[in-house]
UniProtKB/Swiss-Prot annotation:
Protein name: Large ribosomal subunit protein eL24
Function: Component of the large ribosomal subunit. The ribosome is a large ribonucleoprotein complex responsible for the synthesis of proteins in the cell.
Protein family: Belongs to the eukaryotic ribosomal protein eL24 family.
One GO CC term on file: cytosolic large ribosomal subunit
InterPro entries found in the cross-reference section: L24e/L24_sf, Ribosomal_eL24, Ribosomal_eL24-rel_N, Ribosomal_eL24_CS, TRASH_dom
Organism: Ictalurus punctatus (Channel catfish)
């Protein structure tokens, strides 16, 4: 037994009951009774009519037991160590004064620059020693004659 739902009121319609309304666009509406059909055809809003299921749902009617509010899970902040740094180190860095942190940063930058300069200097020396004897006259490229085609005449293609 297939039980339908009323398109207006939302109540169950048992087989053999209630009118069916088919619109020109092919949409079919089933109603519980003539009262629902006439209300639908006069374009009444079922949410504003007291006896419909939609109204009762909207205004929270007929809920026998008070449903306790769902507890939402809140994100809790939790501090933990990051790979390569323990929690104590992180907290110590955070509690440092900005001047100290700035001085440390500048010192680290200076050390990195010096290391880079030293590396470049050694690289320069090694490249000069290997490049010096292998100095030969560069070959000149011979220009190839370009093939000149006749101008294109005619339509688009």
């Amino acid at each position: 037994m297939k039980v339908e739902l009323c398109s207006f009121s939302g109540y169950k319609i048992y087989p053999g009951h209630g009118p069916v309304y088919a619109r020109i666009d092919g949409k079919v509406f089933q109603f519980l009774n003539a009262k629902c059909e006439s209300a639908f055809l006069t374009k009444r809003n079922p949410r504003q009519i007291n006896w419909t299921v939609l109204y009762r749902r909207k205004h929270k009617k007929g809920q026998s037991e008070e449903v306790t509010k769902k507890r939402t899970r809140r994100a809790v902040k939790f501090q933990r160590a990051i790979t390569g740094a323990s929690l104590a180190e992180i907290l110590a860095k955070r509690n440092q004064k900005p001047e100290v942190r700035k001085a440390q940063r500048e010192q680290a930058i200076r050390a990195a620059k010096e290391a880079k300069k030293a590396k470049q200097a050694t690289k320069k020396v090694s490249t000069q020693s290997t490049k010096a004897p292998a100095k030969a006259a560069p070959k000149q490229k011979i220009a190839k004659p370009m093939k000149v085609s006749a101008p294109r005449v005619g339509g688009k293609r």
